[in-house]
Amino acid sequence: MAEDMAADEVTAPPRKVLIISAGASHSVALLSGDIVCSWGRGEDGQLGHGDAEDRPSPTQLSALDGHQIVSVTCGADHTVAYSQSGMEVYSWGWGDFGRLGHGNSSDLFTPLPIKALHGIRIKQIACGDSHCLAVTMEGEVQSWGRNQNGQLGLGDTEDSLVPQKIQAFEGIRIKMVAAGAEHTAAVTEDGDLYGWGWGRYGNLGLGDRTDRLVPERVTSTGGEKMSMVACGWRHTISVSYSGALYTYGWSKYGQLGHGDLEDHLIPHKLEALSNSFISQISGGWRHTMALTSDGKLYGWGWNKFGQVGVGNNLDQCSPVQVRFPDDQKVVQVSCGWRHTLAVTERNNVFAWGRGTNGQLGIGESVDRNFPKIIEALSVDGASGQHIESSNIDPSSGKSWVSPAERYAVVPDETGLTDGSSKGNGGDISVPQTDVKRVRI
């Protein structure tokens, strides 16, 4: 569909980068002036530009111009945005299992509002691999998408093609939610921590390896109240109101940061950062990032593609500080599956890790094991902010595409064919039970 796109360039005064978010192999950013940019892998429509092309540099998502977007969030291969003024939640990308919330499982190559959420005031949105959640201003939670392990919190294992309210939170005001591959976590306004969904590695923090179909409160926090939570692929990170960091779940690659490879079934305080006040956290597929109140960024876990950002490709079992030019302080971080994004106080955006599909936004498809400035989004870039613009021709761009048109279902080692996780290239070792669908 590249021939249907008229590409030019937008040069404007520097705009503040408000939000960054990293998916499996794509990235998005929200800039002041109501500009949404996306880049990286586009095969499933997750970039929203009306085609299936990869983009190695940030490209303005013209379909959302004028919609006054206030948040953007990446799932693995889909994206969700919220317009506060219009009270609309938009979604696009890979649609299998209903993760787009439109009542079907088709892929969508341009943003479309979710009818079931029209008119609802949204406070926060979280996207996992194949499911999504939205927290309303009233503290209620809506969930939709894949639910084979109960990650929607609805009390069953049926996928939901449209958002449904989590009834288990009736009378409980939720502050925020986080979504992993097949599990979910939440923090209440009162600082209580909850987990539900797939719990095989202790990633629910409930002291066992059992799935939960409805949210269950985590009681083993030593009396600490939590202010935030984030989910990696199969691990979970939380921060208390005192700024202490806790991790639990899968630790095969050191992603819990405790200096070993042991899983933890309950929240375990990360002593290596006990002298720091943690202000933000993010979980990748097998790596973790934590930002301190004084602008220092620490990373640990799986580092095959340099996604930890410390200048090598060795796994890190304990936190290591990520260094930036001129010791710039970091104000925001987001982990993708195998890449990481960060924004500094000077309004510069950096990326590192896997770059095969252009998800680093640096204009080329190469890996980086240390922070590389995204010149198109950064004030300190060689030419300042210089964002490409794609103008979609609505008469010729893609809209709905059924997954059956582009994928074949293959059996796993048990002979079953009802699995989920789609591979993103042959460069990774994915458990056989995770690979059930392949492109044709």
From Swiss-Prot:
Ranges for region Disordered: 413-440
Originating species: Arabidopsis thaliana
Keywords of this entry: Acetylation, Chromophore, Cytoplasm, Nucleus, Photoreceptor protein, Receptor, Repeat, Sensory transduction
Resulting phenotype, W300A: No effect on function, homodimerization and interaction with COP1
Annotated consequence of substituting W302A: No effect on function, homodimerization and interaction with COP1
Keyword Iron-sulfur: no
A molecular-function term among this protein's GO annotations: photoreceptor activity
Intervals holding RCC1 repeats: 2-31, 32-84, 86-137, 139-189, 190-241, 243-293, 294-345, 347-399
Knocked-out gene: effects: Hypersensitivity to ultraviolet-B (UV-B) illumination. Abrogated induction of DHU1 in response to UV-B. Disruption in a plant lacking DHU1 alleviates its hypersensitivity to UV-B.
A Pfam entry, by short name: WD40_RLD
GO CC terms, sorted: chromatin; cytosol; nucleus; plastid
Subunit structure: Homodimer in the absence of UV-B, but absorption of UV-B induces monomerization of UVR8 and interaction with COP1. Interacts with RUP1, RUP2 and histone H2B.
GO biological process, alphabetically ordered: entrainment of circadian clock; response to UV; response to UV-B
SUPFAM superfamilies, sorted: RCC1/BLIP-II
Effect of mutating W285F: Loss of function. Constitutive homodimer and no interaction with COP1
PROSITE patterns per the UniProt record, alphabetical: RCC1_2, RCC1_3
Chain residue ranges for the region called Required for interaction with COP1: 397-423
Name of the protein in question: Ultraviolet-B receptor UVR8
N-acetylalanine modification, residue list: A2
InterPro entries per record: RCC1/BLIP-II, Reg_chr_condens, Ub_ligase/GEF_domain
Effect on the protein of changing W94A: No effect on function, homodimerization and interaction with COP1
Known function: UV-B specific signaling component that acts as a UV-B photoreceptor and plays a key role in establishing UV-protective responses in plants. Upon UV-B irradiation, UVR8 undergoes an immediate switch from homodimer to monomer, accumulates in the nucleus, interacts with the photomorphogenic repressor COP1 and regulates the expression of the transcription factor HY5 by associating with chromatin (through histone H2B binding) in the HY5 promoter region.
Superkingdom, taxonomy of origin: Eukaryota
Intracellular or extracellular location(s): Nucleus; Cytoplasm, Cytosol
